[in-house]
């Protein structure tokens, strides 16, 4: 580089240095705006050195990284070894691909040079063919390896997909089978429960009939027939065998509880065994009720609303049962109510005794054929407590209503219950009983009144004598009649006295 003159050095001091942007070189800016284009007279090498210096001016010197030092001697295999080449060869390959424009003089030189190149190319062709064959063989081997790797990966993916598909199918089938088993078990439980309720409903007739049995042995001995003793022994044997079957059934249902059948068949022994079995079953029953009530509450989302946690419906089943059984005296009284007006043999009430005694004092003339004699007694005895009967009408009605509601809700559309209900609904909606002749006075309207015999005033057992009757009718006419037998003279004197006396207005008078 030529040495600058003094004037050039002074002018360089006054001229500001331009800001250089290294990105302009990559963006291929035009010559006028290019920062690395030099218009001064000088060698090309000097300008290139200045350009590289300007490009690398912002670089910061740094040492080699530790990772690069560690990985310098790592051998990754033949597949990852590349061929060493220079940057000029890469640029030459790119320049060869670009079309060039040659002058006519250069074409002549090129023709002469082609002959020389043909000779050289013949020598180099053999070497190139060998190199190409080796490159082809190596590339074919690499392609084969890549194809094998791809096929192996595809096989692995297929195996994974098949395993995942089989796992999903097995899981879905297992969940479906579990749901089917749960549904089948629930159906069997419902059927068993319905059968038990059906047996209980059929047993209600025998419970009602048992309330009519004699109240004690003396009454039984008075009212028994010739076959009564034999029938009683047969009934006892059947009841004892029924209890034995129930004990065996309880042992089969729950293996943890052991109920032993008593050797001596007596009511006291069977009651002891039953009470012991109930005590064992009570704890297990409470656990099961608490477990399933909690599951039902969690599934329905009742625990999410804590505002109504003090309501009875939000309490556990065990707590509800204990609350209902807390007032045992009231429940026992409810079982002794005579709702069906059943009278055991040999049982008489105080009302019946009083009624019989009152009938003895009554006369025959006062009997009324229109009023039945047992009406008042029947009204009074109905709903009273009777220690000799057992009536669980409340529990029976609850079971019956639940069974009917369940049958109506879960019955098929073609079942008899739903058909009858639908027919009743249609008849109520469509067929309204309208009397067309009841308007405009074309039909006489009347209401049948109930008999008022029960509301009649009571009659006493006393009667008026003749004097009282005569005195009553005489007072209606405003006169005073002396019913005693007197002489005519006394009557005349009394009449004269009566004419002088003004009648009193205290009595009952007709016509003023």
Curated annotation (Swiss-Prot):
GO terms for biological process: maturation of SSU-rRNA from tricistronic rRNA transcript (SSU-rRNA, 5.8S rRNA, LSU-rRNA). Its main location: nucleus. Residues 104-133, 488-503 have a biased composition (Acidic residues). Residues 1-151, 342-378, 488-512 are annotated as: Disordered. It is found in: Nucleus, Nucleolus. Residues 27-42, 52-64, 349-364 have a biased composition (Basic and acidic residues). Coiled coil: none annotated. Keywords: Nucleus. It holds the Pfam family TRAUB. GO terms for cellular component: nucleolus. InterPro entries: AATF (IPR025160), AATF/Bfr2 (IPR039223), AATF_C (IPR012617). Belongs to the AATF family. This is Protein BFR2.
